[in-house]
């Protein structure tokens, strides 16, 4: 595929449980690795898929934001050997403001 300038991409949609970042990462890992195995170079996951989109008031709780950051760290470590660029959505707090963000990582 590279001979023609193409990049193999994959969009994966894991089962998401609202507020359960660790469980959501558990659901993402086999999908990410399954997409990387046949050669996907870019793997995109949904917006806010680490925490779930409909957290509502939970987004104001430090515990949810901290669990999302920890879960992202785990996801990065467990995907270090796949070689693909992975893009995943999560809430990020910066200077007291909450943002709906996408984290992109490759090779840990």
Which ranges hold each PLM region?
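Hydrophobic structural segments
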Residues: 1-107
């Amino acid at each position: 595929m590279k001979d023609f300038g193409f990049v193999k991409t994959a969009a994966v949609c894991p089962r998401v449980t609202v507020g359960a970042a660790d469980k959501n990462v558990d659901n993402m890992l086999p999908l990410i690795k399954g997409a990387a195995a046949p050669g996907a170079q870019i793997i995109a996951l949904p917006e806010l898929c680490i925490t779930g989109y409909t957290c509502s008031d939970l987004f104001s709780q430090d515990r949810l934001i901290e669990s999302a950051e920890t879960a992202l760290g785990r996801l990065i470590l467990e995907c270090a050997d796949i070689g693909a660029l992975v893009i995943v959505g999560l809430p990020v707090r910066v200077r007291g403001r909450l943002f709906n963000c996408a984290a992109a990582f490759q090779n840990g």
